[in-house]
């Protein structure tokens, strides 16, 4: 694989779009030229032949490749860089089908006060249905004190409801930090913008002498610019942070210089959610690959593509002349973690899979310094790190549920010890410890796989919710499963998107398993036998794992 440093023009990985398809001042022939030059994949000629920028972008069906007017582009930059704006306080992303999806909600904003949540979908604004070709930002924004009515499909229930919100000026806080419990450096990063790396460095320097653990909260971070890489400064030693592959097949890379200062050797715990996307996923994957910490939370959004913003400041003068305050944001790269893994569609799986309600509390139970006396403490060896947990704190009513779920989330590779006396550590299983402490513990592992040579692999997948068994807690490892059932199970577990293409001649388009088989094939998980998949052939559950 060839490597080159990433040129300045192509170094931006922006994700949020505040618009759908506004009327474009960009000439259609210029849109064609830019897409043919920079888009990550070859675009069918019938799409490029369409008669307007709006039609081309709509047919492309890429929610990340968008045109922004000057007003919309400025609003986008305000959101990324942390400015004060008038609105309802949400970051949104175009949906592939209908409406726009809320990715995060600002504290003390009208949206938060109304009870909206990340994952909710805005279907209409003041009775105007949001469809392709419409700009939701111009409908949502307005004067301070005026009202706007949103039709929302609630993520939690699927119910559609109207919410009337009063617009107000909201400041978009990119990074905030605080020393929690006297020894945890807590850094909340809601976006990657121009000031992010400087503020994070400030946090590391200010709290570094006291921090026994770093927590970086990316749960509301939908990405931003490529400062996800510069955010890494201070934790990482030199090395590649991300590979980005464009349509030319060359792998560009972003790296930390060998002379970059290392401000801390204290491990970092990254908090993730389904709304952590793009640069947030890039950072979480780099933390894992470079072994400087772990992640706790839920699987991330799964945006493994990066965008280039072409505007009047583009280094290519010919391109810059095409714009006057507006821009065209184009998907130009697929990005990969330093270990070669992609998060596209599948997301980044955290080290500990913890529910949203318990994520923060579980992380705050961990410490990196060994206590002077073992008695009353727990030692956890996980993913190459050793953490310590104060038992009385973990058993407190405020932390009991989070602690129980942390024990349930431990994979087979983790080792758990209970301290006694001055320096004695006795290994225990999470289930045994939970029983001694009277916790309401439910094992995610299977009760009938201990004799299988694949027991650890099976139980690891079970802990991360990637395979399921029977209601009685068994897996039946020697039973068989068809290839069609296997494909459908894994595609569902990974939440793979269904492609339009059919890959195998023996998989009918209307077969119940067709979506799963084609989704797996599109991601390259298997290729079948020539053009034949053999959906009815069987494998055992063990072989499946």
Predicted segments with their positions:
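Interdomain regulatory linker/hinge segments that flank or connect interaction modules
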Residues: 27-80, 149-151, 156
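C-terminal "post-core" interaction segments
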Residues: 179-442
């Amino acid at each position: 694989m060839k490597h080159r440093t990433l040129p300045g023009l192509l170094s931006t990985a922006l994700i949020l779009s505040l618009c759908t398809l506004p009327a474009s001042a960009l000439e259609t022939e210029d849109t064609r030229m830019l897409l043919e030059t920079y888009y990550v994949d070859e675009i069918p000629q019938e799409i490029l032949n369409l008669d307007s920028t709006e039609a081309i972008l709509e047919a492309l069906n890429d929610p990340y490749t968008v045109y922004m007017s000057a007003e919309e582009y400025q609003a986008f930059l305000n959101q990324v860089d942390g400015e004060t704006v008038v609105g309802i306080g949400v970051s949104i992303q175009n949906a592939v089908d209908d409406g726009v999806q809320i990715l995060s909600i600002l504290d003390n904003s009208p949206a938060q006060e109304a009870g909206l949540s990340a994952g909710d979908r805005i279907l209409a604004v003041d009775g105007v249905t949001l469809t392709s070709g419409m700009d939701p930002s111009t409908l949502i924004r307005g004067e301070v004190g005026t009202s706007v009515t949103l039709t929302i499909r609630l993520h939690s229930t699927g119910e559609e409801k109207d919410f009337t919100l009063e617009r107000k000026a909201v400041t978009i806080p990119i990074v905030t930090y605080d020393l929690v419990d006297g020894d945890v450096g807590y850094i909340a990063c809601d976006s990657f913008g121009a000031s992010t790396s400087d503020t994070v460095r400030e946090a590391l320097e200010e709290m570094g002498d006291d921090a026994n653990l770093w927590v970086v909260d990316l749960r509301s971070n939908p990405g931003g610019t490529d400062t996800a890489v510069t955010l890494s400064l201070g934790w990482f030693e030199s090395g590649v942070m991300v590979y980005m592959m464009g349509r030319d097949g060359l792998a560009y890379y972003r790296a930390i210089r060998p002379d970059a200062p290392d401000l801390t050797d204290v491990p970092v715990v990254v908090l993730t959610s389904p709304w952590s996307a793009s640069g947030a996923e890039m950072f979480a994957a780099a933390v894992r690959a470079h072994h400087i910490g772990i992640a706790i939370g839920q699987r991330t959004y799964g945006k493994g593509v990066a965008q280039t913003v072409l505007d009047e400041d583009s280094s290519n003068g010919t391109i810059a002349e095409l714009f006057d305050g507006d821009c065209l944001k184009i998907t130009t790269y697929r990005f990969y973690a330093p270990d070669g893994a992609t998060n596209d569609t599948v997301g980044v799986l955290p080290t500990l899979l913890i529910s949203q309600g318990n994520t923060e509390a579980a992380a705050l139970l961990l410490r990196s310094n060994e206590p002077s006396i073992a008695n009353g403490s727990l030692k956890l060896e996980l993913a190459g790190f050793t953490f310590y947990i104060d038992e009385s704190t973990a058993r407190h009513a405020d932390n009991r549920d989070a602690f129980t779920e942390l024990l349930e989330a431990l994979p087979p590779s983790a080792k758990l010890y209970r301290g006694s006396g001055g320096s004695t550590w006795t290994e225990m299983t999470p289930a045994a410890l939970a029983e001694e402490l009277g916790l309401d513990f439910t094992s995610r592992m299977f009760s009938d796989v201990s004799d299988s040579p694949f027991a650890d692999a099976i139980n690891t997948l079970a802990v991360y919710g990637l395979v399921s068994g029977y209601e009685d807690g068994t897996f039946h490892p020697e039973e068989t499963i068809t290839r069609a059932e296997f494909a459908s199970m894994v595609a569902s577990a990974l939440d793979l998107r269904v492609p339009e293409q059919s890959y195998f001649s023996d998989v009918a388009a209307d077969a119940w398993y067709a979506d799963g088989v084609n989704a797996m094939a599109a991601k390259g998980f298997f290729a079948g036998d020539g053009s034949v998949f053999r959906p009815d052939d069987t494998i055992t559950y063990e072989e499946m794992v």
